[in-house]
Amino acid sequence: MFRIVNGEDYSPAVQQRNSLDFGKAPSLLWTDHGGSNDRCETGGNGRESGQDRVKRPMNAFIVWSRDQRRKVALENPQMQNSEISKRLGYDWKMLTEAEKQPFFEEAQRLRAMHRDKYPGYKYRPRRKAKRSQKLLPADSSVLCSRMHIEETLYPFTYKDGCAKATRSRMESRLSRSQPTNTASSLLPQEHRSSWTSLSHNRVT
């Protein structure tokens, strides 16, 4: 149900991820995963209400960094949270295994307490809801402009109000172009007739 604490849980990648989580919210100074995405539910009733969500037990890095973060913040009041997190991650990597051991033991104790308090606990990260993509008024005008350009290739493929306007514009263009085409088609015939009559007059 719970993993045994080992060196893999405190690899540089995991430490960097935890340190980045620290920089997201001030509440992370005292908890390991205080963000809404890292809150978990208990395995008792499967509900996900505010009372049922349980935070993960702190790991060794969080146990060590909660005091170190406050110390660094007091010494460097102008330093951003992200910079503090990077510094803490680097400092943690520089510690020896002997220096990290007390924090590993404390993390194990916290895990045991957490397991006793929430025996059916399961870590279930909350998924972010996808935002529905809606067309804004500006997007609609852009779509109409694009249809106006591409209407010769895709005249009736759109199924919104712009399609009707596009179709009416095309029909009006066709109606205007037909007399012009007829007149232009008659020009060569009239031209040939005039040349024929002129040649006939010269022969006679």
From Swiss-Prot:
The keyword Transcription regulation applies. One of its GO terms (biological process) is male sex determination. Residues 54-122 bind DNA. GO terms for cellular component: cytoplasm; nuclear speck; nucleus. SUPFAM superfamilies: HMG-box. The keyword DNA-binding applies. One of its GO terms (molecular function) is calmodulin binding. InterPro entries: HMG_box_dom, HMG_box_dom_sf, SRY, SRY-related_HMG-box_TF-like. It comes from the Eukaryota. Keywords: Activator, Calmodulin-binding, Cytoplasm, Differentiation, DNA-binding, Nucleus, Repressor, Sexual differentiation, Transcription, Transcription regulation. It is found in: Nucleus speckle; Cytoplasm; Nucleus. Residues 32-52, 169-204 are annotated as: Disordered. Residues 175-187, 194-204 have a biased composition (Polar residues). Transcriptional regulator that controls a genetic switch in male development. It is necessary and sufficient for initiating male sex determination by directing the development of supporting cell precursors (pre-Sertoli cells) as Sertoli rather than granulosa cells. Involved in different aspects of gene regulation including promoter activation or repression. Binds to the DNA consensus sequence 5'-[AT]AACAA[AT]-3'. SRY HMG box recognizes DNA by partial intercalation in the minor groove and promotes DNA bending. Also involved in pre-mRNA splicing. PANTHER family: SEX-DETERMINING REGION Y PROTEIN (PTHR10270:SF161), SOX TRANSCRIPTION FACTOR (PTHR10270). Belongs to the SRY family. Interacts with CALM, EP300, HDAC3, KPNB1, ZNF208 isoform KRAB-O, PARP1, SLC9A3R2 and WT1. The interaction with EP300 modulates its DNA-binding activity. The interaction with KPNB1 is sensitive to dissociation by Ran in the GTP-bound form. Interaction with PARP1 impaired its DNA-binding activity. This is Sex-determining region Y protein. It comes from Megaptera novaeangliae (Humpback whale). The lineage of its organism: Eukaryota, Metazoa, Chordata, Craniata, Vertebrata. The gene is SRY.
